[in-house]
Swiss-Prot record:
InterPro entries xref list: NUDIX_hydrolase-like_dom_sf, NUDIX_hydrolase_dom
SUPFAM superfamilies assigned: Nudix
Residues forming coiled coils: none
Boundaries of every Nudix hydrolase domain copy: 6-143
Highest taxon listed in the record's lineage: Viruses
Name of the gene encoding the protein in the UniProt record: y06L
CDD domains, A to Z: NUDIX_Hydrolase
Entry-linked Gene3D superfamilies: Nucleoside Triphosphate Pyrophosphohydrolase
Name assigned to this protein: Uncharacterized 17.7 kDa protein in e-segB intergenic region
Length: 151
């Protein structure tokens, strides 16, 4: 009998300025040898059994990965569920009010993982508002495909 693998669902929030610069975090340790850029990502993560909804998961992940909570969750628009990879879908929520640089001044990642040397390090180690023209260089291909189609 063939085993059926269930797709996991991740959820994330898209925050943009009026000029469509996207709030992103730099993924710690993501710069590969010989590559110029680190990988950057939006605040997102797996929807856990303890989450009440995908929106709840997106808000939790945003807080864990960025420490950012200075927004009105009632202004998050559900953009839907997108195929992220063969084993993962991504549900995205868009903050409908443009954000400002100053809003992210005190961001800090509180979500840690153990690196190959056994040291606990934050998932994200820097934050920035990334212009649309740079997305293809800093995003992973799955996120870029989705964001390019949306915006």
């Amino acid at each position: 009998m063939q085993e059926i693998k269930m797709k996991t669902l991740s959820a994330g929030i898209i925050f943009m300025t009026e000029d469509k610069d996207l709030f992103m975090g730099r993924v710690t340790g993501s710069r590969k040898t010989g590559m110029m850029a680190h990988r950057w990502d939006i605040p997102k993560g797996r929807v856990e059994n303890s989450d009440l909804s995908a929106l709840d998961a997106a808000r939790r992940e945003c807080l864990e990965e960025t420490g950012f909570s200075n927004y009105n969750p009632d202004l998050l628009e559900d953009l839907g569920v997108f195929k992220y990879s063969s084993n993962k879908d991504l549900q995205l929520f868009y903050y409908t009010i443009p954000v400002e640089h100053e809003m992210f001044r005190n961001c800090r990642c509180e979500s840690y993982f153990e690196n190959k040397d056994g040291v606990m390090i934050p998932e994200m180690d820097a934050f920035a508002l990334i212009p649309r023209t740079q997305w293809q260089y800093v995003m992973g291909p799955s996120l870029y495909r989705i964001m390019n189609n949306l915006f």
